[in-house]
Amino acid sequence: MSSPSVAVARQVPSASRPVPLSWILLLALLVHGPLLLMQLPNSSYDANLHKFFASHYAQHWFDPWNQKQFTGFSQTTYPPMEQQWVALFSHLIGLNLAYMLVQFIAILLLPVGVFRYARIWVDERAASYAAIGSVLLGSLAFLVYNAGQLSTTWAAPLYLIALPYYYEWARESRFSSLLKGVVLICAAASAHHVTLIFASFIFALPVVAMAIMDRKRDDADASVGGVVMRTLIFLALSAAGVAIVLYPFWRVLLANPIKQMPIPHASRSNYFLQWTLAMNYLIVPWGALLLGLPYIFVKGLKEARLRPLFLGFWVAMLFALGGSTPVPKWVLGRAFEVLTYERFVLLANVMALPILGLMAADLMDRFGRKAAFTLGSLAALTCAFAVAWPVYYQNHDQDFSVQEVVQFLNRDGHDKFRYITLGFGSHKFDEVSTYTTASSVDGDYNSARLLPEMTQYGSGQLTNSKYFGVNGMESLRAILKHADQYGLKFIFVHDRYYEPLLAFAGWREQEVYDRGAVTLWVKDGIPPARPTAYQESMRPTRMEGLMWGTLPIGSSILAMVLIFLLPDKRQRAEHYEFPVAAHEPVLREAR
């Protein structure tokens, strides 16, 4: 006869336990991995711009001077870290897959950052739900698959990972946390300067408030003065590190502050006056998270511990609404006309996730699997709709081949002259720039341009001239008038709207490509291109090129080394009461 056994009592429901971070990263792989392998981000708005920058680093790592756009410009006008990683990986897997890999790393970093950031305010279970939500955010899918804002999706997670190290340093005076936090801040700044400026307030100030509030919590025993002093030390070291790592960027910015006429952008409009803007900048990136706004406001204002987080969310939300409210313009002044505001949706969503993690925990405690299924379905639909949105709201014209254009420019010495494209859109224009050896008068990164024909009219790229109305066409006419000065001999046209202007200005059609989709217009008597005085004065020195090729990417490598060599202190385990049966265990024989 076998020995007696004890009947098993009820177990702690799995829904009441935190979800392991490894499972959340697996979810990110399952959701975004196939989409990235399909290379869906390739068609996003800014993807080719990042690949254009990366292709230059792949060939000229220590020389950030790029001749291919604006008759020559310095890539020190844009922080380079993620583009340098794309350049490195491109030698192994090609440019397109390298972009996908670097974007995937950013996607994996986001739930890690959200989990660490949320733990400052909520327990491990709610933080794990917040991390799950970050994988399925509509704003993340919008920035990855529609806007192509690789820099924002890289910088934001790095700040989220860095700030908990500041929190530990300020409360516990742990030097390893200070070191890792400062290096991560430098790495985040090397990914994006705009996120640096705004994350310093939106993400960081609530954490500073919590460091003061929690100065006696757990094992910490700090004073208000001590927290403030350590905050100033962290701030000073971070500022010094960012100043050194991005020195070439700051030098160019101070030597050439942005004074050009503002360029219109839809994100500065009032979203509530046009349904397409409301869909593109409000409904799609926010998705089902809009349904949680009442809970965020009530919970965030009710609980003192959540108020700093809520205030950060509220500020980010006001900026995410762009020109729908006057607040961003009041705060930023003229700088309002320089920024675009779709990126602030991600910042606002991230600030809301810890509170929504509490909501998810409450709902699952009440309704169990029904709540889990409903929340999961809403999050999945939000992500799916944002991924599919470019199919219904295209941000560039129908695809066409530019291979013959590139081949023409790269043969028979044609790259001695400059060219522009008309009707290509910035996406295709950047593709041409990436693979040709010729230089263009046009360019895509607006902050890098210095030519007066482009800075004085308040229009964007020449290839999109007609979409900027009178200002855009006047800018194009000014460039055509000075074709001799710039060595502008070739114009590739994908929109017949421009052909009467070209014919009137003395250009003639010479060749046809891609079964008539593209025509080549040339002008006789144009001398070969030569350097322009506007651009050569901004050329980086060799020392700046050396700094640019080592410090930004070096900060990210150093951060990885420090995190590996100085592992985080293990958090105290959260205890669960062992479930005890209400009656004596039943003894029975096992047969």
Question: Model-predicted segments: where are they?
Answer:
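Transmembrane catalytic cores of multi-pass membrane glycosyltransferases
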Residues: 43-46, 188-297, 301-307, 322-328
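Membrane-helix boundary/interfacial segments in multi-pass membrane proteins
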Residues: 70-72, 141-154, 258-280, 310-359, ...
